[in-house]
Curated annotation (Swiss-Prot):
PANTHER family: UBIQUITIN DOMAIN-CONTAINING PROTEIN 7SL RNA1-RELATED, UV EXCISION REPAIR PROTEIN RAD23. One of its GO terms (cellular component) is nucleus. Transcribed by RNA polymerase III (pol III). Expressed in seedlings, roots, stems, rosettes and flowers (at protein level). The gene is 7SL2. Residues 74-93 are annotated as: Disordered. It comes from the Eukaryota. Residues 76-86 have a biased composition (Polar residues). Belongs to the ubiquitin family. GO terms for biological process: flower development; leaf development; vegetative to reproductive phase transition of meristem. Controls phase transition from the vegetative to the reproductive state. Involved in the maintenance of the shoot apical meristem (SAM) thus preventing inflorescence meristem (IM) formation and subsequent inflorescence stem development during flowering. Regulates leaf and organ morphology. Residues 1-53, 184-263 form the Ubiquitin-like domain. This is Ubiquitin domain-containing protein 7SL RNA2. Keywords: Developmental protein, Flowering, Nucleus, Repeat.
């Protein structure tokens, strides 16, 4: 994803941010491009400093602007009292994200980053019928149980999209569905145009990479064709972090996961 960096002086530059990069890696790219040391950079989002070891997906940097503050050089001749006063002023500026205008703020260079291009903004759209009820589909279980493919021929009805309540087999009392069930079903849309949608049952706590492994096994069995090129698993136009769980990626029951070829 290409991002333009605009400064208060009117100059600008551009950097490319990849899907799985951490905040520290973004700072290193700025240092390599502009010569600004990583130790001088502080990235803010919604008034909070970003942690170097977290990924850009953690902060939804795909859709939000960043504020880059460059710390001024320290004065070796400054007294302890002056240092403490400067620290207090700096804390106030950090709290207000440098919005207030003061003489001290002129020592800082602020850089605003905004998203200008998303490689997935032009993804093909699918109809509601394609997503909810393909005529021929397969159900695969990913997790502790033996994987099994089941062919179904029923056409899903859009009127049946409401979630049902669970009933205890030994009791007529209804129980509400949990917010994050241990197992749930996702719909996988193959990269190649196909009339079938693959239904896969996954564990909420399993990493997304388990789904990729299962798709490779299905290809080996001749049940689907994966892209020849490297591809990403994408849900709601956001790439999934495969080393994290489905729950961490906020994948819910009934969500659609697409296979998008790497650009």
């Amino acid at each position: 994803m290409n991002v333009d960096i605009d400064t208060e002086t009117g100059s600008s530059f551009s950097i490319t941010i990849d899907f799985g990069e951490t905040v520290l890696q973004i700072k290193e790219k700025i240092e390599k491009s502009q010569g600004i040391p990583v130790s001088k950079q502080i990235l803010y989002l919604d008034g909070k400093a970003l942690e170097d070891d977290l990924h850009k997906i953690d902060y939804m940097i795909l859709f939000e602007s960043l504020l880059l503050r460059i710390s001024p050089d320290a004065d070796p001749n400054q007294s302890n009292e002056q240092t403490e006063q400067s620290k207090q002023i700096d804390d106030k500026k950090q709290e207000f994200c440098g919005i207030q205008d003061s003489s001290e703020s002129k020592k800082l260079t602020r850089v605003m980053a905004r998203r200008v291009h998303n490689v997935y903004s032009s993804l093909p759209a699918y109809s509601l019928d394609e997503l909810l009820g393909p005529k021929y589909s397969a159900t695969v279980t990913v997790g502790g149980r033996t994987n099994q493919v089941v062919q179904t021929t029923e056409q899903a009805s859009t009127s049946g999209t409401a979630k049902e309540v669970l009933r205890d087999s030994d009791s007529p009392v209804e129980k509400k569905i949990k917010t994050n069930p241990m197992k749930f079903t996702v719909h996988v849309k193959p990269y190649q145009e196909d009339t079938k949608m693959i239904q896969v049952e996954v564990n909420a706590d399993d990493n997304v990479e388990e789904l990729r492994k299962e798709l490779v096994k299905m290809q080996e069995r001749g049940e689907l064709n994966l892209p020849h090129e490297a591809f990403h698993l994408v849900s709601s136009e956001l790439p999934l972090i495969e080393t994290k769980s489905f729950k961490w990626n906020r994948v819910a029951d009934g969500d659609t996961i697409e296979l998008i070829r790497e650009k």
